[in-house]
């Protein structure tokens, strides 16, 4: 195998694929990136039994072939290279990476030991990447970080026709966000449980590339996302998610409009005196909301932020 490609193109591709690598892979080969060179195209893939990532880049392929090398080491190497063309070549049991006068030699891992990548599910529709990323950012903050309750580390994604609803809770907070999308089947009706960290990673790495394609399999254990030639899959979380939609009121008799940045900053300051897992109180009156924390002889704090009651 031997191919040549611009440094920035290779760096971007390797960096994206390496983001899916587990810091503690269950088997050594899963720390590697699978690189396949064919006529004019190089594909790079990673897999950890839960998530997979794959993409293709154009390259000058002199000799076709396939190798498996340490993803994190290759990522560190290509990021350090100067702005010039990079040649990647298999030489015996080593992979040589050459850029101008820089030359690196990497050990390979047995390609035959690498598990087969999951088949990509069929395209189910497209959604605006920016809207998807914004919704994910708003909802995942309410997902649990406690792995002893894996069901709550997931976000429930409900799809009904042209509407996608994201729901999350950690038992203390609730979050829900609806966005529109363009389904291939207008009558689609399904729900998925996707790990919050998976959605966050998809939003970061694929949400800025225009339209985001959502891929749904025939079985209920895999979901995929694709944008700009990059494709990723994730195993779904199994279990019964709490029925939290009904906890959101149909309407609210009173609404308060407040500057987001001012409320966040005030909350951070007042929370400095709050003990762990204690409440920060919010009192709404005409023209302001007062934040209060701490009681008795302990430290206390309060701050008011302008607001409009509707």
Swiss-Prot record:
One of its GO terms (molecular function) is DNA binding. Belongs to the beta sliding clamp family. NCBIfam families: dnan. The lineage of its organism: Bacteria, Bacillati, Actinomycetota, Actinomycetes, Micrococcales. It comes from the Bacteria. GO terms for cellular component: cytoplasm; DNA polymerase III complex. It is found in: Cytoplasm. Forms a ring-shaped head-to-tail homodimer around DNA which binds and tethers DNA polymerases and other proteins to the DNA. The DNA replisome complex has a single clamp-loading complex (3 tau and 1 each of delta, delta', psi and chi subunits) which binds 3 Pol III cores (1 core on the leading strand and 2 on the lagging strand) each with a beta sliding clamp dimer. Additional proteins in the replisome are other copies of gamma, psi and chi, Ssb, DNA helicase and RNA primase. This is Beta sliding clamp. It holds the Pfam family DNA_pol3_beta_2. InterPro entries: DNA_clamp_sf, DNA_polIII_beta, DNA_polIII_beta_C, DNA_polIII_beta_cen, DNA_polIII_beta_N. Confers DNA tethering and processivity to DNA polymerases and other proteins. Acts as a clamp, forming a ring around DNA (a reaction catalyzed by the clamp-loading complex) which diffuses in an ATP-independent manner freely and bidirectionally along dsDNA. Initially characterized for its ability to contact the catalytic subunit of DNA polymerase III (Pol III), a complex, multichain enzyme responsible for most of the replicative synthesis in bacteria; Pol III exhibits 3'-5' exonuclease proofreading activity. GO terms for biological process: DNA strand elongation involved in DNA replication. Keywords: Cytoplasm, DNA replication, DNA-binding, DNA-directed DNA polymerase, Nucleotidyltransferase, Transferase. It comes from Micrococcus luteus (Micrococcus lysodeikticus).
């Amino acid at each position: 195998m031997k191919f040549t490609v611009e440094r920035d193109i290779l760096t971007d591709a390797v960096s994206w694929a390496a983001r899916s690598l587990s810091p503690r892979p269950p088997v050594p080969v899963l720390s590697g990136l699978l690189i396949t060179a064919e006529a004019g195209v190089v594909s790079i893939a990673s897999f950890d039994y839960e998530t997979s990532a794959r993409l293709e880049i154009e390259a000058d392929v002199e000799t076709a072939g396939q190798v498996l090398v340490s993803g994190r080491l290759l990522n560190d190497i290509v990021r350090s290279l100067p702005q010039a063309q990079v040649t990647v070549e298999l030489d015996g049991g080593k992979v040589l990476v050459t850029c101008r006068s820089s030359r690196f030699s990497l050990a390979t891992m047995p390609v035959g030991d690498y598990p087969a990548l999951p088949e990509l599910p069929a395209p189910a529709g497209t959604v605006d990447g920016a809207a998807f990323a914004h919704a994910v950012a708003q909802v995942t903050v309410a997902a649990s970080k406690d792995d002893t309750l894996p069901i709550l580390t997931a976000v429930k994604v409900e799809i009904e026709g042209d509407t996608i609803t994201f729901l999350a809770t950690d038992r203390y907070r609730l979050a829900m966000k609806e966005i529109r999308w363009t389904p291939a089947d207008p009558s689609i009706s399904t729900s998925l449980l996707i790990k919050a960290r998976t959605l966050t990673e998809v939003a970061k790495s694929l949400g800025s590339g225009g339209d985001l394609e959502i891929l749904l399999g025939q079985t209920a254990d895999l979901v995929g996302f694709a944008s700009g030639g990059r494709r990723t899959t994730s195993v779904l979380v199994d279990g019964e998610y709490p029925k939290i939609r009904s906890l959101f009121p149909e309407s609210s008799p009173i609404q308060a409009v407040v500057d987001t940045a001012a409320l966040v900053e005030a909350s951070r300051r007042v929370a400095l005196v709050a003990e762990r897992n204690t409440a920060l109180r919010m009192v709404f009156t005409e023209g302001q909301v007062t934040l209060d924390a701490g009681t008795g002889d302990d430290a206390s704090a309060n701050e008011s932020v302008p607001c409009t009651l509707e």
